[in-house]
């Protein structure tokens, strides 16, 4: 699936449960709901309990995209400066991490941190941005996940994890293949995910556990392309699966820590997705079911019109085992 514009050149309890190996089981997923579906292209969702951030085209047809933020109950506002383009990455509290694209040819890309409540930039630690192409950023708990290097080029592509407090940096993956890509997905709690195709369409999704320092390759169905991963705090990964080409048997999937991959929703024919973003909703009584709202942008392959939808995926946390006598 191709991407719009230059993007690709672009909770304590749950954390504790994941750390000790508690498994959650699927309950149900809701029907897809439109989130942003206006006359302009709207892509690249990111969300928190109180904020939603996305990119919107300046014209009804394909055109440069600006980044907008909207607090619940308030009007949206533009985030990126004039004469730039931008894509959302992730929201952690009121801090937004995003990709800023500059230059007449949109050939320069860096990462930014932004205070949504105060509406101003925050300092980015030295060494995150370089003269190379940084993109595809995500943020959680003081860790920044991002990509460096142009995909489908002779660049050395890196998937990096950077601690914004200590400066520790981990290289999660790397690739040098002019027919491939290594692209960061999302970090949530102690889990990070990314995609590597070497070459495309031979693609795999990886899940990294920060606590143990281990990487797991997700199972892939033979002959299928997998892409656009996101992850929640319990390690469940959401992604797209399809045949090669736009809108070819596209299936939004979920892969829990244990068990087989499952379909979470249906997609109309000749539709495809580019970005998924997983946000864990606040728990509701009795507390044994947790819900992840999965946002995704969807494109009509013939008209190239983009909208944003969401689906709620619920999982049940089993009761704790009785103490050993």
Spans of model-derived segments:
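Structural motif
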Residues: 58-68, 102-112, 149-160, 200-206, ...
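Multi-bladed beta-propeller domains
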Residues: 29-40, 72-84, 117-131, 165-180, ...
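Loop/turn-rich, solvent-exposed surfaces of beta-rich toroidal or solenoidal domains
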Residues: 223-254
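Repeated scaffold domains used in trafficking and secretory/extracellular systems
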Residues: 39-48, 83-93, 129-141, 177-189, ...
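Blade-level signature of beta-propeller repeat domains, shared across WD40, Kelch, NHL, RCC1
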Residues: 273-325
